[in-house]
Amino acid sequence: MRASPTSPPEQVVVDASAMVDLLARTSDRCSAVRARLARTAMHAPAHFDAEVLSALGRMQRAGALTVAYVDAALEELRQVPVTRHGLSSLLAGAWSRRDTLRLTDALYVELAETAGLVLLTTDERLARAWPSAHAIG
């Protein structure tokens, strides 16, 4: 019996909001994010890790996560297969979007646009500001 050929994973840009929901497991969106990211090849701008770190730190300071939990989440983040892309080639395009997007969000949008990939987010504000983004959850 021959195995059926498998299709290559879908290439996507994932933003920090989706990864935080996945790692923190504190929102109802965690399962939706996990399901949507299954069998994808993820890409993100290089500032992705800093944004995830900042969000997890805010959650810990607010009492939603323990220090030990954040430590474990950061280890999990280190192991997530996300291809990080340098920022220098994205800066001008992100800057051109300054009137409609937060500049950190514009870096994700610019990467998705220039690479021709879908942007996945759980950030409702980003999804409203850039309708081509696919909101999860």
From Swiss-Prot:
The keyword Protein transport does not apply. The keyword Metal-binding applies. It comes from the Bacteria. GO terms for biological process: positive regulation of growth; response to host. Gene3D superfamilies: 5'-nuclease (3.40.50.1010). One of its GO terms (molecular function) is RNA nuclease activity. This is Ribonuclease VapC3. It comes from Mycobacterium tuberculosis (strain ATCC 25618 / H37Rv). The gene is vapC3.
